[in-house]
Each structure stands twice: as C-alpha cells, then as structure tokens.
Design a protein with these regions (language model features):
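Predominantly flavin-linked oxidoreductase catalytic cores and closely associated redox partners
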Residues: 104-230, 246, 262
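Glycine-rich FAD pyrophosphate-binding loop
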Residues: 7, 20-43
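A conserved beta-strand/loop capping segment in the N-terminal third of enzymes
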Residues: 49-100
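FAD/FMN-dependent oxidoreductases across multiple families
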Residues: 120, 210-286
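Beta1/beta-strand and adjacent pyrophosphate-binding region of the FAD-binding site
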Residues: 1-14
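Residue-level detector of alpha-helix initiation sites
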Residues: 12-13, 37, 145
C-alpha cells in the first residue's frame, strides 16, 4: 500500500494546474495519466483572451501560439469580426500545451506518471488500484475528463450530451479563424476552422440528441470537401463533452476539476479556461477550505447563461428566430463588442 497526500487522476489542463498549485505549496502530489502521452485530445486548441491571461504569467512563451482575429457567421450570414481585440484567439496544439504544463507541474515538485490507468476506486477506504498496487489518498482529485472514473464513483450522472469532431490537417493554413452557426444542419452546434502554426483544425460540435455523432461526421466531411480540404491520411477525431455541473468538492476529500466537473460551456464548448481556473481554485480550497474561488464563481455564472441560451437554441421553434437576431446584432456596429464580450470574456 502506497500512501499519497494528494492523488490526481488525469494530466490535462485541470489536473496539471491542480498539481502545480499544490506542489508549489509544498504538498506531496502524484498525478496518474492513463494515456502514454500527455496532452493530445480532440480540441480546436483555441485560447481566448481570458485564457491567455491565465497562461502567460505561468510562463507560456509568446511564440508558442498563433494569434488570429476570429470571425463568426450566424445562420448563413456573412462572416464578421465582432471586435478585433476581444475575438483575438491564440491557437496551440494540445500536445504542446500539455508539454508546458507538465514542465511547470514537475518543476514545482509534483510527480507525474503517464501510461498508468487507475481502477477500483474505493471512496470509503480512500484507495485506488494503479500500476499493480493499492494507493491510499488523503485528497483525490478527479481531473480525468468527460468520461471521469471519479465522477462515476461519486454516483453523479454523466450524460456527456455533446459530441465534437475534427480533422487536424498538417501543413494547411486555412484562414480566417472562424466559427459558423448552421442551425439548419447542426441545430445549436457550430462548425469551426482554427489555423495553427503547423496545421489547421477543421471541426464541428453539436448536442448528440439533436445531431447524432455519425450525422455530425458526415456534415464535417461535406464541409471539408466544400473547402477543398483533403482528408487523405488525416485521422478523424471525435470525443464527447460533459457539460452537466454538479460541484467541485465532495465528502471524503474528493474533488472534481475541469471536464470531469462538467464546467464546459454548452454554448461555446470552451473548456481550457474553465479547466485552468477550476484546477487552480480547487487546489487553493484544498489548501485553505475557506479560500474564495472568484474565477470559478464568475465562470459558472457565465456558464449558466450560456447553458440557458443553448437549451433555448435547441428548440426548433425558437432557433431560427434567435440566430436571426444574432445575425442582426452582428451587423450592428455598436452591439458587436458587447456580444463578443458576453460570448468570450465571461
């Protein structure tokens, strides 16, 4: 039996941020990642301004990302820039983001083991099986993504109601960076083109109960063909998203952060920012139970509004009218910045 003060399952943005904060405070931290490589995940890899304000002070180099001004099109309307400042998006490969965060966490003193899945979580005994032995924890942090084993062990529902699909096409610089709402085909989901330094992510996201994953893939394939994007030798990537939030702190020293906690916006599908801030503030609450969590609180307030609008847009009777309203707002100069702020600034 191995005893660990803080055991983190999952080495994504949330888990590595938890690890970094706890290790910097002098705590014993072990992170277990089931995948052999840390970082890769189905994700457009977009960092909004608020996300960059989290990562830059941590040491993310200025040349690690590609900066692009984002465009948006509502309901078949033309592509517009809502606000050049607020819609500036930095793109980074998740492999690269994981590499930087791994460096920061290990530099702070955390132990991170990749290729080590965990099983047999026993919340009563505070133990888990990993690497052929039992590990006992004082605090268990589930940062293990949408299909979280820790979330399941807590008995929380895990509907994972959204599905994202993408192709990461190497050597392609397809511009501009854009999001296109296409309510006739993918309901309240959207299509994206996110150029990176070495590739372009072309993808789409939608609720599974309205647009089946197989239908979303066919839609994405059709959009790629329309853009002249070859998919030869480019693997299709798909993943479910958890947007149902039930809390971050639970009895018995168990905590959830990031996708495992369901903090993704069901409107924008933005998840990296929420993973970083919940990871940081879960760690700070472990260190000081009465510590405030202002960034998490603010984000959850934004998420609630996003989720309400997303549910509204899921209704066929109101979808077209609402997207039409957004298209009108996007054509009204003095309304563009407030809309961009609400969607992206949180």
């Amino acid at each position: 039996m191995e005893d660990i003060e803080h055991l983190i399952l999952g080495a994504g943005p949330a888990g590595l941020r938890v690890a970094q904060v706890l290790a910097q405070a002098g705590c014993e931290v072990l992170v277990l990642e089931k995948h052999a490589e840390i970082g890769p995940k189905t994700c457009a890899g977009g960092l909004t301004g608020k996300t960059m304000r989290e990562l830059t002070p941590l040491g993310l180099p200025a040349d690690a990302t590609l900066a692009s001004i984002g465009h948006v099109a509502f309901a078949g309307g033309r592509q517009v820039v809502l606000d050049a400042e607020l819609t500036l998006v930095h793109t980074i490969a998740r492999r690269d983001l994981g590499r930087y965060q791994l460096q920061w966490a290990r530099g702070a003193g955390a132990t991170v083991r990749a290729g080590v899945p965990a099983s047999d979580i026993d919340l009563g005994e505070r133990t888990v099986r990993a690497d052929g032995r039992r590990i006992r924890w004082r605090h268990l942090i589930g940062a293990d993504g949408a299909d979280s084993a820790v979330r399941r062990a807590l008995g929380l529902p895990s509907p994972r109601t959204y599905f994202a699909a993408e192709y990461n096409v190497p050597g392609l610089r397809l511009e501009p960076l854009r999001i296109e709402c296409d309510p006739g085909a993918i309901a309240n989901g959207y299509f994206w083109v996110f150029p990176h330094q070495a590739y372009t992510s072309v993808g789409a996201v939608a609720p599974k109960r309205v647009v089946a994953p197989a239908t979303l893939r066919r839609y994405l394939d059709g959009r790629c063909e329309g853009l002249g994007v070859t998919r030869e030798d480019v693997p299709f990537e798909g993943a479910t998203l958890e947007v149902a939030y039930h809390g971050c702190h639970f009895p018995g020293g168990v905590h959830l952060a990031g996708d495992a906690a369901g903090v993704i916006s069901s409107l924008t599908a933005e998840g990296i920012y929420a993973a970083l801030v919940t990871g940081e503030e879960v760690a700070r609450t472990i260190l000081e139970p009465r510590a405030p969590a202002p960034k998490t609180t603010s984000w959850l307030r934004t998420k609630r509004w996003h989720d309400r609008l997303s549910r509204w847009l899921a209704r066929p009777a109101t979808r077209d009218r609402t997207f039409g309203l957004f298209a009108s707002v996007a054509e009204t100069r003095w309304l563009r910045r407030p809309l961009a702020s609400w969607l992206l600034n949180g």
